[in-house]
A protein has these predicted regions:
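N-terminal Sec-pathway targeting helices
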Residues: 1-15
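Aromatic (tryptophan-biased) beta-strands that constitute blades/sheets of beta-rich domains
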Residues: 6, 25-99, 110, 117, ...
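Extracytoplasmic beta-rich repeat domains
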Residues: 90-103, 131-146, 152-169, 180-196, ...
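Hydrophobic alpha-helical membrane-insertion segments, chiefly the h-region
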Residues: 15-26
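Conserved core beta-strand positions within WD40 beta-propeller blades
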Residues: 63, 108, 148, 199, ...
Length: 473
C-alpha cells in the first residue's frame, strides 16, 4: 500500500514539474523582460545626433567607410538624397555568400565573400579593380581609414568545419592596389573592425578584444571578456562598447583598455543568452538586442539598464537609430520601431521571413532584408518564407519599395547610388529622375529627348513600389 502511494506521488510530481517549468518560462517570457524607460533619465539630446550631416568633403571621399557608417554604428545616412523609383545600373557577382555589406571609399566598394575572396569594385561600373584570395572565412565588413582597408577573418577554410578555437587574423591592405601591408594573427574574428585615431579595435572568439596599432599591426593592449565576442565594437566619448556570448555588455576606456563598466542581460533559470548584435550608441545610450529577443537600452556613461522591451523570438541584428527611434528586426519575421527614450513600440511590420541583418536608414527610408534560412534549426519560432529587401517609411512603417533579393544586411549608399546586397550579388541603383551632377549641365539642352529615352528604358527598372504608396512619402 505504501509502495503504491509512493508511486502515485512520484508520478504526480513528475507530471507537475514540466507544468511548473512551463509556467515559469511563460511568465519569464511574458513579463520579466519588460522595463519602461524615461526621457528624463540619461537621455542626452545635446550631443551630435545620428541624423546630423557630415562635411561634404568627407561624404565624397568616405561615403560609407565602416559597418554601420559611423563609429557609433548608428546605421543612419542623412547625407544622401536617394529614393525610389530606382534604375538598376549594374550587378556584381561575388560567387558565394555575402554575409555583411561592403564599405565604400575612394570610389570603390570593398567587400569579402564568405570563402575568402576580397574584392575592390568600381562604384560606377561594377567591375573588379583588384581582388585577393585568403585561406580564411569571412563574416564581417571592412573598415577604411587613411587609404588602408582593414578586414577581420574567421577560421581557415572550409568554413564551419573547424572548432571555434581555430585561428583567425586581421589584414591591412592598400586601398588602391590591394597590397598586403600587415597581418595580425589571433583567434577567429567574426566582428567588423573599428578604427579610432591610430588604433584598430576588434573582438575575437578567443574572448579577447584587441586594440592594434594601425601602422604596425602590433597590439597596444588586450582585454579578456567573459565569453566569445561576435559583437562588433562601437565607440563614443572615449569608450569602446561590445557584447559577448555570455550575455554581458562592456564599456572600456579606449586608450587604456580598462573596464569602465559591465552590464548583463536579464537571466532565465540562472542563465543568460548572448549579445551577437553590435551595440548602437545614440542619445547617451547603448541600444543592443539579445538573442533571447529582448531589446535593451543602457546608459552609455553608467551601464545602468534604462529599458528592456520584449521584441520577438531572437534578435541578431544591430539596431539603427534615427530621429528618436530605434529600429530592429526579429526571427519571427517582424521589423519594429521603438521610442528611444521609453522603449515603447511605435509600429511593427510583418516581413516574409526572419530578419537577421542590420537595417539602414537612408534619406528617411529604413531598409532591411528577410532571410528565409535563418533560424531554420532554432529551438524557438523562426519565420520561413521568401527572401527580399524592404524599404519602409521610417516614420510610419509603411512599405515604399521592395527588391526580390537580400538576406542579411542589405543596404549601403554613396552620394549618388544605393547598393543592395543580395545573397551573393550586389546591385547598384540610381534614382530614375535625377541626372548625375557631373553631367547635369551637359544634359540640359537635351532634357526632353533624354527624358523620352529614360522613359523607354524604365521598363528595365527593377524593384517594386508598394501598392498605393508614394516613394516620396
Amino acid at each position: 500500500m505504501l509502495r503504491t502511494r509512493l508511486l502515485i506521488l512520484v508520478g504526480f510530481v513528475a507530471a507537475l514539474v514540466p507544468g511548473v517549468a512551463l509556467g515559469f518560462w511563460l511568465h519569464d517570457e511574458g513579463t520579466i523582460d519588460y522595463k519602461r524607460g524615461s526621457s528624463t533619465v540619461e537621455f542626452v539630446t545635446t550631443q551630435k545626433k545620428p541624423e546630423q550631416k557630415r562635411p561634404r568633403a568627407v561624404v565624397l571621399r568616405l561615403p560609407w567607410p565602416t559597418y554601420g557608417l559611423r563609429v557609433q554604428r548608428t546605421h543612419t545616412a542623412a547625407d544622401f538624397d536617394i529614393r525610389p523609383p530606382y534604375r538598376l545600373r549594374w550587378t556584381f557577382k561575388a560567387h558565394h555568400v555575402l554575409e555583411f555589406p561592403p564599405s565604400i571609399a575612394y570610389g570603390r566598394l570593398y567587400v569579402a565573400q564568405q570563402r575568402g575572396r576580397f574584392f575592390a569594385v568600381h562604384h560606377r561600373t561594377g567591375k573588379i579593380v583588384w581582388q585577393r584570395r585568403f585561406d580564411h572565412c569571412s563574416a564581417s565588413s571592412p573598415t577604411i581609414a587613411y587609404r588602408v582597408v582593414y578586414h577581420a577573418w574567421m577560421q581557415p577554410l572550409p568554413c564551419n568545419r573547424f572548432p571555434r578555437s581555430q585561428p583567425g587574423m586581421i589584414t591591412a591592405m592598400a586601398a588602391r592596389t590591394g597590397k598586403l601591408i600587415w597581418r595580425f594573427d589571433a583567434g577567429a574574428f567574426e566582428t567588423s573592425p573599428l578604427v579610432i585615431g591610430r588604433t584598430l579595435y576588434a573582438g575575437s572568439w578567443d574572448h579577447k578584444l584587441y586594440a592594434i596599432n594601425i601602422y604596425t599591426g602590433k597590439p597596444r593592449w588586450t582585454f579578456t571578456a567573459d565569453g566569445e565576442i561576435n559583437s562588433s565594437a562601437a565607440y563614443s566619448s572615449g569608450k569602446i562598447y561590445f557584447g559577448t556570448d555570455a550575455g554581458s555588455l562592456y564599456a572600456l576606456d579606449a586608450r587604456t583598455g580598462r573596464q569602465r563598466w559591465r552590464a548583463q542581460a536579464l537571466s532565465r533559470f540562472g542563465r543568460r543568452e548572448y549579445f551577437y548584435a553590435t551595440p548602437t550608441i545614440a542619445y547617451g545610450r547603448v541600444f543592443i538586442g539579445n538573442s533571447d529577443g529582448t531589446l535593451y537600452a543602457f546608459g552609455a556613461s553608467s551601464g545602468r539598464m534604462l529599458w528592456a522591451q520584449r521584441a520577438g523570438t531572437y534578435i541578431y541584428t544591430a539596431a539603427a537609430v534615427w530621429r528618436g527611434r530605434v529600429y530592429v528586426g526579429t526571427y519571427d519575421g517582424y521589423f519594429m520601431a521603438f521610442n528611444a527614450a521609453t522603449g515603447d513600440r511605435l509600429w511593427r511590420f510583418s516581413a516574409s521571413s526572419a530578419v537577421h541583418g542590420a537595417p539602414s536608414v537612408i534619406d528617411g527610408l529604413v531598409y532591411f532584408a528577410a532571410c528565409p534560412a535563418c533560424g531554420s534549426v532554432a529551438s524557438r519560432y523562426s519565420k520561413q518564407g521568401a527572401r527580399g529587401t524592404y524599404a519602409l517609411n521610417a516614420l510610419t512603417g509603411k512599405e515604399v519599395w521592395h527588391w526580390p533579393d537580400g538576406v542579411f544586411s542589405p543596404a549601403v549608399a554613396d552620394s549618388q547610388h544605393l547598393y543592395i546586397v543580395g545573397r551573393s550579388r550586389i546591385f547598384s541603383f540610381a534614382p530614375k529622375h535625377r541626372a548625375h551632377p557631373a553631367r547635369q549641365e551637359q544634359q540640359k539642352p537635351k532634357r526632353k529627348k533624354q527624358g523620352r529615352r529614360s522613359a523607354a528604358r524604365s521598363d528595365t527598372t527593377s524593384g517594386t513600389p508598394a501598392p498605393g504608396t508614394s516613394a516620396r512619402r
